[in-house]
Amino acid sequence: MTDHIRDLFLHPRPTYSIAGAAIVLGMDVREVRGWVEAGELEGIDTENGIVLPWAEVVSFAMDLWSQEVIEEALRDELATVIPELVRLARLEVRVPRFEIVALERLAGREGKSVDAVLARELLDFASVHSPWIGTEVPGFAAALQWPE
């Protein structure tokens, strides 16, 4: 998996064929084609068939692999490929126990970490408040749109 992650982020191509995306994602071509047909990967029709833009493949990969795994795989090159505001940071909060239980149960049901579930929910929060936060924090709008 580390090799796939490093290839995708450190050796990006403008677009990937279905087969190329399958290789870089470590998936079967039929599986990638299924994700395209389901609308989870949005391709562009060309004379040579459907291609997937790099940003689309990266967005999909960020759901396929945890961000912790991606950042660990990129090691020293992390800062060169993922913007600072997009990189993981530690946050300690105190919330009611029922919210923690809810996060843990949902994470377990989805096969994800509590961090991943909470990050997804906070992305929605950040998106809702982005018009204001974008005026307060330089680079916020770009981070919210990354990898576009």
Describe every region a protein language model picked out.
Residues I23, I44, P96-A116:
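Surface-exposed, Lys/Arg-rich phosphate-binding patches that contact polyanionic backbones
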Residues E77, S127-E148:
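Short, positively charged interaction helices/loops
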Residues A55-A89:
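A short, Lys/Arg-enriched interface patch at domain edges and termini
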Residues V57-V58, K112-E136:
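Short, basic amphipathic alpha-helical segments that act as recognition/interaction helices
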Residues S17-I18, P53, S113:
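Residues that mark the N-terminal boundary/hinge immediately upstream of a DNA-recognition element
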Residues T2-E31:
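Polyanion-binding surface elements
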Residues V24-V51:
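Major-groove DNA-recognition helix of helix-turn-helix-type DNA-binding domains
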Residues E31, E92, A116-V117:
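Residues in the helix-turn-helix
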